[in-house]
Amino acid sequence: VAGICEGRVVVVTGAARGLGRAHALAFAAEGARVVVNDLGVALDGTHGDPNTSTGPAQQVVDEIRALGGEAVAHGGDIATTEGAASLVTTALDAFGRLDTLVNNAGFLRDRMLVNLDEDDWDAVMRVHLKGHFLPLKHASAHWRAEAKAGRAPQARVVNTSSGAGLLGSVGQGNYSAAKAGILGLTFVAAAEMGRYGVQVNAIAPAARTRMTERTFAEAMAAPEDGAFDAMAPENVSPLVVWLGADDSAGVTGRVFEAEAGRVSLM
């Protein structure tokens, strides 16, 4: 039986670990060909030990291929024009099309407001907000050109906000502001790009990742008794795959909370 993303080409940013990895594997399981983007940076965005951080995107590509799927790695910095543009060209060169963009990349530099310096503010705003804007801009330009050439796409964008973007989070002024900005960007992009066959939605997920394990260790811990692992990142991915598929036709400009196996429409 064909998956709901059979024939689609999907780009996932920040896809080497956590939610991004779960999304990439889930899309591949539903028949998509996947561009796996990741820089392999540490939790705070700095480059870690080169012996442990090299090639994380390729590792996920290898997982997908081992399961019979198709994928390629992309190691560009999506918060640069060159890196974001090459996301699109990588998809086109490898698979001949681009159907879905999942903006997921990010990291944390948590500080209370009075201790938050400009570097920490700028770095977090750059990866989250600019790292959403630039891939969205370049993918949208491609889809607009396709539509104007008479090849109207059924394109999908899934942006990643957070409960911090909806309600704020103590010690995360930079992160909360960036995630709130992503919501505004989502609403504008949905309004502007609908005429070209592009749907744009956002999720506000809660899941166990490198970013949350340290900050919310107790809440994110996996159960020891084999019970349902409510905070596993794989619980969020079915929603993302559906939003990235043809099946979500007509759904745009919306925000979905996904937590502990539950989905709420905001």
What are these model-predicted stretches?
Residues P223-M266:
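C-terminal helical subdomain
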Residues S162:
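Residue(s) in the substrate-gating loop at a strand-loop-helix junction
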Residues G3-V36:
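Canonical Rossmann dinucleotide-binding motif of NAD(H)/NADP(H)-dependent dehydrogenases/reductases
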Residues L136, A178:
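Active-site helix of classical SDR
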